[in-house]
């Protein structure tokens, strides 16, 4: 069997299994999460190259489902967050981002798993964090907001989720400014109630 054939079969299985055992449809959610700052872009974190700093975040989050596919385990949500950072600097952050939620994993009968991706949002902080300043001390209060999240729940209790989130602020590779700073990245753990 060729590699392409195996890939097509895997994708078909990922789509078909969740359709056979579709869960409840939730339109709203509220939750909270906490995390610690790390000093690389999200790609660096996934490669094990992150170092953690003494900057922390506590946040409230809410989301609303805007669209749900009738044939795929896919939906679009609008996610908002309000957070407080402390440690190296104390500041408040507010952000909003459209998020794709993929719920089609073959093991969902054992552990319901959802992947949430929000690559293009808006984040604003009450001040520029010293961790976000470039070589010449410049930074931006308003940056892009990106999140990558894995959410887990019991198949019989999908309204209660725990999640792991990569919370990322950035200038989109200097598209928004050319100060040479990465922005901020937090590895966070949280809880969400869906209704």
Language-model features, listed with the residues they occupy:
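Outer-membrane beta-barrel transmembrane domain signature
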Residues: 66-68, 81-187, 191-195
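Short glycine/proline- and aromatic-enriched beta-strand/turn motifs that initiate or cap beta-hairpins
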Residues: 19-65, 192-193
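A glycine-rich, hydrophobic loop/mini-helix early in the fold
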Residues: 59-81
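Cleavable N-terminal export/targeting peptides
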Residues: 1-26
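Short coil-to-beta-strand
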Residues: 28-32, 71-75, 115
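Transmembrane beta-strand segments that form the barrel wall of outer-membrane beta-barrel proteins
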Residues: 32-36, 42-48, 75-86, 164-168
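Generic alpha-helical scaffold signal
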Residues: 52-56, 70-72, 90-94
């Amino acid at each position: 069997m060729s590699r392409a054939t195996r890939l097509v079969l895997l994708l078909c299985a990922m789509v078909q299994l969740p359709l056979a055992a579709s869960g409840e449809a939730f339109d709203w959610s509220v939750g909270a999460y906490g995390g610690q700052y790390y000093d690389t872009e999200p790609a660096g974190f996934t490669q094990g190259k992150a170092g953690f700093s003494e900057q922390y975040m506590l946040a409230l989050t809410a989301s609303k489902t805007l669209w749900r596919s009738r044939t795929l385990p896919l939906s679009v949500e609008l996610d908002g967050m309000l957070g407080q950072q402390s440690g190296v600097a104390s500041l408040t952050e507010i952000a909003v981002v459209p998020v794709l939620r993929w719920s089609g994993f073959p093991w969902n009968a054992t552990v319901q798993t959802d992947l949430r991706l929000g690559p293009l949002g808006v984040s604003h902080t009450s001040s520029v964090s010293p961790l976000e300043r470039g070589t010449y001390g410049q930074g931006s209060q308003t940056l892009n907001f990106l999140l990558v999240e894995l959410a887990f729940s019991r198949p019989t209790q999908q309204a209660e989720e725990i999640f792991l989130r990569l919370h990322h602020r950035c200038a989109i590779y200097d598209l928004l400014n050319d100060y040479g700073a990465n922005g901020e990245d937090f590895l966070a753990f949280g809880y969400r109630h869906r209704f």
